[in-house]
Amino acid sequence: MIGALARKIFGSANDRRVKGYQARVDAINAMEPEIAALSDEALKARTAEFKQQLASGKTLDDILVPAFATVREAAKRTLGQRHFDVQLIGGMVLHEGDIAEMKTGEGKTLVATLAVYLNALTGRGVHVVTVNDYLAKRDAEWMSQVYSFLGLTTGIIIHGLDDPERQAAYACDITYGTNNEFGFDYLRDNMKYRLEDMVQRDHVFAIVDEVDSILIDEARTPLIISGPLDDRSEFYNTIDTFIPKLEPADYEIDEKQRTVTLTEGGMEKLEQMLREAGLLKGESLYDIENVSVVHHVNQALRAHRLFTRDKDYIVRDGEVVIIDEFTGRMMPGRRYSEGLHQALEAKEHQPVQPENQTLASITFQNYFRMYEKLGGMTGTAATEADEFFDIYKLEVLEIPTNLPIARLDEDDEVYRSSREKYAAILAEIERANGRMQPVLVGTASIEKSEVLADFLKEHGYKQIDFANPKSMAKLYDAARAGKPSKLFAVLNARFHEQEAYIVAEAGVPGAITIATNMAGRGTDIKLGGSLEMRAAAATAGIEDEAEKQKIVEGIKADIEKFKEMVLAAEETVELEPGKPGGKTIKKPGGLYIIGSERHESRRIDNQLRGRAGRQGDPGRTKFYLSLDDDLMRIFGSDRLEGMLQRLGLKEGEAIIHPWINKALEKAQQKVEARNFDIRKNLLKYDDVQNDQRKVIFEQRIDLMRDQNVSETVTDMRHTLIEGLVAKHIPEHAYPEQWDVSGLREELQRVIGLDLPVEDWAKEEGIADEEMLSRLQQRVDEHMAAKSAQWGPEVMRYVEKTILLQTLDHLWREHLIMLDHLRQVIGLRGYGQRDPLQEYKSEAFELFESLISHMREAVTAQLMRVEIVPPDEQPPMPAMEAHKLDPNTGEDQVAQAQSGLAPVAPAKRDPANPATWGKVGRNEDCPCGSGRKFKHCHGRYA
């Protein structure tokens, strides 16, 4: 109460900071007449002036006011748009490396130009990050008009570009692209063998659009470059046949934690089935030799009992395609990890694709923390302000709207069953449609959007495709006639290709759009419809400019009339029904948002609400809930149901009370807090791998930068031999205690030389230092002979290539070991040990082991390496890019050919390991010993 009173008197911290920008806003406005008087040439010349001032020692803050004034004028001349004062404040927030929360329709894309231009003047590059290729391309093409007018270059990074195209885009002053593409380019760059092949520059300044989606929703999503493993499709299919035979009593499901576990009876039943199939070793399912079987059983159980077709995934063209839980979009190419996707393919009787091995990975949390300065924009960040600051050190500033918000947010209506809820939604749609008010219904999944669509069809509504001109003609004709069309469109993962068009036309009078969550985010819904979208569709293929202009003018007139109709679609509600002359209230027209259930996160609900009431337009929002909804069922529906019964609620009646909204908000806050804790805890683990990744990647770049790595290779060789001598000839030991034969055998195994160490050991008075010196000298002579044979230039190339290839190979193996360690480390908690500290300690030991193996493997390969003619080399294998989500186990694969893998010679010489190329761990060793590779040369390579 005291805090609320203080805020009334002094204003909130947010208000005070916004006021702090006013002086600079006034200064920019004061410059406007002077800047407006400049010719185009003089305005363009200001860019060179600003660069000169920076070179003379001025800072970006020193030139902010004139630079912002310049961008505002350039936008007026190129786009016909002038930055509002609140947009100038947004630009300052972005420049300072914080998050600007700006409501839908407030022009975030235009705001970015201010901070982008100012920071691009340094010449070090600015990255603008969006959530998909469509938005990256749209925003880059749109805003590049401003940048090119002012003499700056703009590049776009989208899927499908080759390396030279990417290098050109990154070399530009400003680069637009998606979060996935920026992250994958970073990983691919750190798998290359020449500096000139790398595409990215330094990570200096990035502005992230829809920052909450990228840095919160997808924060735990690792980007992964991977290669294929052995095919185990039949094993997945076999395990899958057992799961349908289990009954509900055989397993327990925890919906909150999203886990499923076998009961004692279920375990016994499954063990019996596995034993009969010959798949169970030992007595119990949980014996050590059955680890792989347990893993496959657990994934098959999850696939059958936790994942629902048409909600979590759909089956299309013989593939299991994941549905994004946040947007409802279909994610082609994305795959669940750890064998879960293969389990789903087996469940749906689709071809089971092989699993992949991780070659390189990074999370968005760690990728975006590499930037020297990071800013973000979104319509909904305030609810996650603590997380943004805690993890990214980003403050969230709520930017005031240019015009007051005229949207009515009504209290939720809660029904006892989903059937009653859908009936109420249908009745509300019919009322809104009768007065020509456009309606957007938000659903949580494809499954629920299609349930609602079927419900509408049963009551005489017809589904159309808003992206189909003929379908739209019917809607426009009905709108012109002022008659309800009873037509509706569904925007979900199945129809995502045209989502921008469908969303843009959701503001046409009488339009009914059903959308999963925030599909189509990034596209404004304009009342009356979108002139740009309609004009582009209507004039496609028409060459005659006069005819085009005539069509566009007709569309303009349509939209003006349509907007008036939508604004007039108010609803008069009687507060005292049946009473003559009773009180009434008017509810606004504009876009009507209906939420069909609450999401776990308040932010997602706020995003849906934010679709209505853009730029001061009127609008309405209302959520319809039932006790069957996921959030209600998991958090306290039993209590609510008892209360509804006590109130004597009849079928079809709803309870409407602000208390319900507050109770739901508290439930959502609990979920948000839990998810934040999960993300924060996972980041602590990921930071361990991230610190090691930075060391490895920096080492790679240093190696690529060095013209001559002979000194590094020699140090490795000498350190390795020192270790071998210390192992077999302990310090202060008598010569008769030396393990000379063991030293000789290990030298032969590791470096491939049979040296007379036994003869040396018999010499009178020889010490361990002398033994070490002779060994190092002989090995150095061997390498010097190779260098003389090939020439110093070839030798330098071979040394660098082997160093990089060995580092990459060991790093990949290290990633697998870290992943396995992370999966089991939680069990240490049962022994009263801190799993995180245990993970840090053991991960460090593994890293030290990697460095040790690096010395051994590099030395071994260089001692044996032979030059192979280029024409004997096979084509390079392809790699794939993946994106995992620890929330759901998703593995998002953006099919990418990399061609960065080291090439193996075509023929294997048993005496020359350098010719063996990649050898499977379970293959027979190419040396001819008859043992498996992992038990022979694979122990150290």
UniProtKB/Swiss-Prot annotation:
Segment forming the signal sequence: none
Keyword Cytoplasm: yes
Binding site for Zn(2+): C925, C927, C936, H937
Region (Disordered): 871-919
CDD domains: DEXDc_SecA (cd17928), SF2_C_secA (cd18803)
Subcellular location: Cell inner membrane; Cytoplasm
PANTHER family (UniProt xref): CHLOROPLAST PROTEIN-TRANSPORTING ATPASE, SECA INNER MEMBRANE COMPONENT OF SEC PROTEIN SECRETION SYSTEM
Entry function: Part of the Sec protein translocase complex. Interacts with the SecYEG preprotein conducting channel. Has a central role in coupling the hydrolysis of ATP to the transfer of proteins into and across the cell membrane, serving both as a receptor for the preprotein-SecB complex and as an ATP-driven molecular motor driving the stepwise translocation of polypeptide chains across the membrane.
Topology of the protein relative to the lipid bilayer: Peripheral membrane protein
UniProtKB keywords: ATP-binding, Cell inner membrane, Cell membrane, Cytoplasm, Membrane, Metal-binding, Nucleotide-binding, Protein transport, Translocase, Translocation, Transport, Zinc
Binding site for ATP: Q87, G105, E106, G107, K108, T109, D524
Necessary cofactors: Zn(2+)
Any one GO MF annotation of this record: metal ion binding
Keyword Transmembrane among UniProt keywords: no
Free-text comment on the cofactor: May bind 1 zinc ion per subunit.
Stored HAMAP family: SecA (MF_01382)
InterPro entries named among the record's database cross-references: Helicase_ATP-bd, P-loop_NTPase, SEC_C_motif, SecA, SecA_CS, SecA_DEAD, SecA_motor_DEAD, SecA_preprotein_X-link_dom
Family affiliation: Belongs to the SecA family.
Catalytic activity: ATP + H2O + cellular proteinSide 1 = ADP + phosphate + cellular proteinSide 2
Stated name of the protein: Protein translocase subunit SecA
Species of provenance: Afipia carboxidovorans (strain ATCC 49405 / DSM 1227 / KCTC 32145 / OM5) (Oligotropha carboxidovorans)
Broadest EC class assigned to this enzyme: translocase
